[in-house]
Amino acid sequence: MLVYQDILTGDELLSDSFPYKEIENGMLWEVEGKNPSGEEGGEDEGVDDQAVKVVDIIDTFRLQEQPSFDKKQFVMFMKRYIKQLSPKLDSENQELFKKHIESATKFLMSKLKDFQFFVGESMEGEEGSLVFAYYREGATDPTFLYLAYGLKEIKC
């Protein structure tokens, strides 16, 4: 099994159990989350109304929700993140990262009001990567976006 860790914090954020699709020139990974408790159709007879509904990715990787960002806060976060991450990339990836991160940032900013923000379980929001979750129109399960260059692949 492959696990993907945040390069900056070491937090596990994703595994190969969750297929991803590269978007924005490979800068972002898009992953479909599931709400297993909401997958069973039919009547809710005997189901506790107080039951907590969990999303698989959030639960599996113990992601911690963060307060929303406004545009200014998000730009500040991205500038800091780029500055922290760039030196950790090899020269080839640094070039690709610098070439495409601006368009990926603009893409994320266009959806900013729709996002829920998450960090890894260490809650190093100032130091690590963000995971973005949003619901597509009509969807009951969230879609997650990961900053791909901030992930390190580890074999387990």
UniProtKB/Swiss-Prot annotation:
InterPro entries: Mss4-like_sf, Mss4/transl-control_tumour, TCTP, Translation_control_tumour_CS, Translational_control_tumour_p. One of its GO terms (molecular function) is calcium ion binding. It comes from the Eukaryota. The keyword ATP-binding does not apply. It is found in: Nucleus; Cytoplasm. Residues 1-156 form the TCTP domain. The keyword Cytoplasm applies. Keywords: Cytoplasm, Nucleus. Expressed in stems, cauline leaves, minor veins of rosette leaves, roots, lateral root primordia, vascular tissues of petioles and inflorescences, base of siliques, papillae and ovules. Not detected in root meristems, anthers or seeds. Expressed in stomata, trichomes and root cortex. GO terms for biological process: developmental process; regulation of cell population proliferation. Disruption phenotype: Seedling lethality at the early rosette stage when homozygous. It holds the Pfam family TCTP. PROSITE patterns: TCTP_2 (PS01003), TCTP_3 (PS51797). GO terms for cellular component: cytoplasm; nucleus. Belongs to the TCTP family. Regulates proliferation. Induces whole plant regeneration when expressed in heterologous systems. Involved in root growth and lateral root development, with a probable role in cell reprogramming. The long-distance transport of TCTP RNA and/or protein in plants may have an important role in regulation of growth and development. In a heterologous system, TCTP2 mRNA and protein are capable of moving long distance in both directions with a tendency for movment from source to sink tissue. In heterografts, the long-distance transport of TCTP2 is necessary but not sufficient to induce emergence of adventitious aerial roots in close proximity to the graft. PANTHER family: TRANSLATIONALLY CONTROLLED TUMOR PROTEIN 2 (PTHR11991:SF17), TRANSLATIONALLY CONTROLLED TUMOR PROTEIN-RELATED (PTHR11991). This is Translationally controlled tumor protein 2. It comes from Arabidopsis thaliana.
